[in-house]
């Protein structure tokens, strides 16, 4: 069997002129500068490949180049395995449970205050924080949704009392956690009664037979959300006013639920700032390695679909379709939502896959092209049979034969090709 591409003319594999390039070698071993400038970033970049395939090393190099060439851009980096934080630069911040001199200590009340409509912003943040819990609650959905309303009521009262005391700092997460973890049903009712006219319906939830179960849900959420909480008054809105800085979100697998909550809400706030009508359309680059570690409730679909004109540039790394669908677990439209997200990426880098599912995923994302398939008969007297088909120009065998650092790339409308990325050091702290 013989495959033949039917492209009318040879295309380059990347833009001939680009402000950002990575050193690599083509399939023949010749040096090549792969163009990955803004023309490519505007269509977002998808990276596939298994563990140890070299994709993180290449992403790290690309991040360093972007920071050098775009000094006025902001960067949000999801760091699941600690591969990026060692390369941080002066002025960068790290969100984690371990503190440190450059720690980003987020405060939900300070984040709300940065908005022109702080109470609406607070309600939106609480909805995002509870979204995954509500979607996966099943028959317990009532209790989780009621806990969301109670938690919002508590934060609303706390914020209004703080705003009445001019000049005083916002209550810290540590202070709020200390009160929430030990509060009784009566204490929570008394707290909500400070805004009785507005929160009367919420207070009534704590007077029925389900009151104890609802408060228990609040305690469970507070335990996860405030785990490792400390003193601090940082906000994403304020962070993004400083060009050239990077915020690293250190997802800790040992504290999976707390990590999901913290990283998801910070991504959501960055996306909300980017999509607001007041945003200055300055570039914000999102590097989401191991993106499937977080549910998509933080607004990934909106970021990809609407963010380009506002300055969003997104790189996501997935291994297979199952990972993407798992981000939408609990939604009736899980599969279609996953496909919608994947359709937003116009450039693909496919590194060595680890399984058949990974191979299928990479070939599907690399796309199809017109090909002539010629089948030769068993007898020399039998004429060959030729048929026109559409198929991926990269075979499963070719993908499985990739070595560490090698990848098949398809950048927007350019031709797919195999490249080997050169190793180099990334400047950092």
Name the predicted role of every residue range.
Residues 304-408, 412:
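Conserved ATP-driven motor cores of ASCE-family P-loop NTPases powering translocation/secretion/packaging/pilus
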Residues 7-14, 18, 24-32, 38-312, ...:
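P-loop NTPase motor domains
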Residues 1-5:
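Interdomain "pre-motor" coupling segment immediately N-terminal to P-loop NTPase/helicase cores
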């Amino acid at each position: 069997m013989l495959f033949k591409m039917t492209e009318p003319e040879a295309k380059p594999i990347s833009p001939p002129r680009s402000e950002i390039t990575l050193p690599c070698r083509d399939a023949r071993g010749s040096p090549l500068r792969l163009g990955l400038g803004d023309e490519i970033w505007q269509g977002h970049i998808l990276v596939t490949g298994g563990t140890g395939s070299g994709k993180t090393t290449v992403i790290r190099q690309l991040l360093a180049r972007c920071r050098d060439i775009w000094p006025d851009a902001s960067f949000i980096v999801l760091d699941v395995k600690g591969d990026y934080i060692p390369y941080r630069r002066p002025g960068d911040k790290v969100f984690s449970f371990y503190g440190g001199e450059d720690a980003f200590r987020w405060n939900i009340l300070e984040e709300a205050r940065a908005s022109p409509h702080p109470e609406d912003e607070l309600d939106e943040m609480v909805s995002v924080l509870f979204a995954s819990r509500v979607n996966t609650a099943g028959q317990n959905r009532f209790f989780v949704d009621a806990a969301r309303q109670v938690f919002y009521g508590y934060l609303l009262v706390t914020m209004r009392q703080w705003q009445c005391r001019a000049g005083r700092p916002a209550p810290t997460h540590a202070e709020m956690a200390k009160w929430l973890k030990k509060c009784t049903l009566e204490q929570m009712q008394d707290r909500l009664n400070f805004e009785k006219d507005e929160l009367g319906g919420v207070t009534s939830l704590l007077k029925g037979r389900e009151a104890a179960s609802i408060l228990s849900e609040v305690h469970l959420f507070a335990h996860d959300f405030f785990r490792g909480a400390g003193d601090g008054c940082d906000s994403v809105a304020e962070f993004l006013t400083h060009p050239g800085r990077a915020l690293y979100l250190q997802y800790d697998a040992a504290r999976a639920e707390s990590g999901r909550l913290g990283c998801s809400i910070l991504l959501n706030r960055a996306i909300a700032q980017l999509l607001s009508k007041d945003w200055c359309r300055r570039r914000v680059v999102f590097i989401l390695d191991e993106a499937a570690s977080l549910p998509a409730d933080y607004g990934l679909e909106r970021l990809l679909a609407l963010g380009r004109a506002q300055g969003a540039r997104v790189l996501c790394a997935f291994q297979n379709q199952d990972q993407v669908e798992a981000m939408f677990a609990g939604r009736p439209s899980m599969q279609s939502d996953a496909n919608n997200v994947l359709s937003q990426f116009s450039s693909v880098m496919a590194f060595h896959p680890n399984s058949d599912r990974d191979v299928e995923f990479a070939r599907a994302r690399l796309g199809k092209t017109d090909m002539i398939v010629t089948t030769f008969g068993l007898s020399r007297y039998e004429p060959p049979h030729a048929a026109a088909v559409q198929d991926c120009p990269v075979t499963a065998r070719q993908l499985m034969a990739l070595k560490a650092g090698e990848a098949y790339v398809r950048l927007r409308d350019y031709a797919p090709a195999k490249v080997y990325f050169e190793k180099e050091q990334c400047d950092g702290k």
